[in-house]
């Protein structure tokens, strides 16, 4: 009986890994551009409602997210992560409240200049291993307020 050798799966080459990563990023950007089209149609009241609802949703999960962050990163204390999550939800939202981010946001009649807020496009959000959840929360809220889709690159640590 002949020895049947098991074929080991081949590991992807660095070039194949890079191509796969580029394809994934391209797909995410394509989805982000679709979201951008939808975001551009929103008025200030709709944007503010979305930010408020996102903030409340994150606030409702602040402790669960804190526990997950500590479990995944093995860094920090749950209590500290929870506090940072609450800060990101409440204080960032309160700071952004009342700030105009849609349409004409300032008029200078003397110079005859109007400042108009427009989304800058799909943005990248980098998150540190030390504060993954609070960083994702506050960057998400800011991206929502400015009507910019955001793609996160989480630290692999």
Label every model-predicted segment.
Residues 97-157:
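Conserved small-residue-rich beta-alpha loop and adjacent elements
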């Amino acid at each position: 009986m002949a020895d049947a050798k098991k074929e080991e799966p081949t590991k992807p080459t660095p070039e194949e890994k890079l191509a796969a990563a580029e394809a994934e990023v391209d797909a995410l950007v394509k989805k982000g551009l679709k979201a951008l089209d939808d975001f551009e149609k929103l008025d200030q009241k709709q944007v503010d409602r979305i930010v408020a609802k996102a903030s409340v949703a994150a606030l409702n999960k602040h402790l669960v997210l804190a526990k997950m962050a500590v479990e995944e990163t093995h860094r920090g204390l749950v209590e500290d992560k929870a506090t940072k999550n609450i800060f990101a939800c409440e204080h960032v939202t309160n700071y952004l409240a009342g700030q105009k981010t849609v349409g004409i946001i300032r008029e200078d009649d003397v110079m005859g200049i109007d400042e108009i807020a427009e989304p800058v496009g799909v943005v990248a959000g980098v998150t540190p291993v030390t504060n993954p959840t609070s960083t994702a929360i506050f960057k998400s809220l800011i991206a929502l307020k400015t009507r910019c889709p955001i793609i996160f690159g989480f630290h692999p640590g």
